[in-house]
Regions:
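Hydrophobic alpha-helical bundle cores within soluble ligand-binding/oligomerization subdomains
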Residues: 1-244
Length: 244
């Protein structure tokens, strides 16, 4: 009965959105995106305006002004994973040299392990059926383990960002393992991440009961991580965060 009342009194005439020029879904009436900010980190070219009409074109993705096609060609030609150097590029605005990449990979290695007791309190004791929900809760729990969670200076924000980059795959894998055990009746298998492995390799190792994966699987996952690495330059989620 109450639900019917809500349906009857909470409906908004769709024509009002056009009348008041409301940007539904952060889209203009012609389907183009609403400009809500400026960024030099990532950009996407997916259409052009011809005679006031939006015309689709072959999509292009740029990170810090570098075409992702060129970025991928570089690390795949040298047969190395690319997500780590892509993260470096997005954060610092330039590609790392050989020595800098080694240091960066080493830093991510040292940050992958979760704090003592974290997986028990944040994941195992409250296993969820929805992995995204589990990840969101784990990030909130990370507040309790951060030595300076409320500081907003660049150094603190960078430290937190690096920790999240390193630990997100571990949290996601552990959340899946907890779901598989408590909700799907499977054995619980939680390994520690290994140093010397890429982000993609560690994720696959943590997800598999036997810890095994093929080079092709690692390469494909690494490529997926590269293509999804920049998701904060002006998308709906980031806009909502800025507004709130």
């Amino acid at each position: 009965r109450y639900a019917d009342k809500i349906r009857a009194t909470g409906k908004i005439d769709p024509d009002l959105y056009e009348k008041y020029n409301v940007k539904r879904g952060l889209r203009n009436a012609d389907g183009t995106g609403v400009l809500v900010g400026l960024t030099a980190i990532g950009s996407v070219h997916g259409y052009m305006i011809s005679e006031s009409e939006k015309v689709s074109v072959p999509g292009q993705l740029f990170y810090r002004g570098i075409n992702v096609n060129d970025l991928v060609k570089g690390f795949q030609t040298e047969r190395r994973p690319g997500f780590e150097e892509t993260a470096y590029l997005l954060l610092f605005g330039e590609l790392p040299g050989v020595r800098e990449l080694q240091l960066w990979n080493g830093l991510l290695d040292t940050c992958r392990r979760l704090p003592d007791g974290f997986k028990e309190s944040a994941i195992i004791r409250s296993p969820g059926k929805d992995i995204m929900n589990s990840i969101a809760r784990a990030v909130l729990m990370a507040y309790l383990h951060d030595p300076a969670p409320d500081r907003l200076d660049v150094e603190t924000t960078l430290r937190q960002s690096i920790s999240l980059i390193a630990q997100f795959p571990v949290i996601a894998a552990y959340a899946y393992q907890a779901k598989a055990h408590y909700h799907m009746g499977q054995s619980l298998m939680m390994r520690y991440p290994e140093t010397g492995k890429s982000t993609a390799e560690n994720f696959l190792m943590l997800m598999r009961e036997d810890g095994l994966y093929s080079p092709l699987e690692a390469e494909l996952l690494d490529l997926c991580l590269v293509l999804h690495a920049e998701h904060g330059g002006g998308n709906n989620s980031a806009f909502t965060t800025h507004v709130v």
